[in-house]
Amino acid sequence: MSTILICGHRAYAARGLKSVLEKQGHTVLEFSRGEMKREGNTVTGPVVEIDKNPLFKEDVDVVINFILLQNGSVEENENYIMALLQFCERHSVKRLVQISSISSYPNDAPLIKEDTPIDKHVELKGGYGIIKTAADNLLEKKKDAEPFDIVFVRPGYIVASDNPHPFKGIAKFFGSKLAVLIGDKKATLPCIHRDMFHQCLAEIAIQDMPLCVYLLVEKNNSTKYSYFRSQSRAVVIPLPRRVFFLAADIAKALHVFKERHVCMVKGAFKVNRFDNSLTRNKLKALK
């Protein structure tokens, strides 16, 4: 069995993962931001100094990284990634599993597969997408020089009953019975339930000859509208695609919008197809 470190164990997407891994016989360590302290197998401390944290005494086989400095700059997030790579080297890590996102892919990619290149135009992404894509770009540049595997896991929208913000980026509520969809009825929102996500991670952590990228989306290519309908009975009004595209282009022509703002508007309406056949063939949890 392996010693597995979960970085960012308090994250919504990570809740319950420790139990899944421990039931399979692994020793699980946890790390998150906080004062320098260790209680049992849970360590806290400055995130960007994880490599210098003296409370990690043991070697680690696998690191699963959920940490994203959402209120931090791209530079701060890249500094954390560099510190994490140093930690992995110092603690004899064999595999770093980076929890990435499908938002790392270009908005205009019609078909997304495991080998689809991530977006190189980081500056055109929204705040969350900028950070995720910048971290992925940095890790891709570094992975060949590292003595351990770097594996990217790109899940769809993670669904669970305890999601504190189930409609963030999807719909804006006005009262409890009316909402505006951030996009139209065709805008895609591939999803994966968190329990299935965790079962996949348990396989990925120890799998022989892992894929470079795992694309974790469930079979039905769902949309923002279908997701909303599964979560709420409120009246929801989709936005008109053509009107918003035209408005964004006019705003750019008038120098009110920059190209990034136009991409963010059009990204809310993006329609992608997903083919994760390689991932499905590799993971029992998705079969």
Give the location of each predicted region.
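NAD(P)H-binding glycine-rich loop region in Rossmannoid oxidoreductase-like domains
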Residues: T44-A83, F87-R90, Y105
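Conserved Rossmann-fold NAD(P)-dependent oxidoreductase catalytic core, especially the SDR/UDP-sugar
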Residues: A83-G127
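C-terminal amphipathic/interface module of NAD(P)-dependent oxidoreductases
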Residues: S222, A234-P238, E259-K287
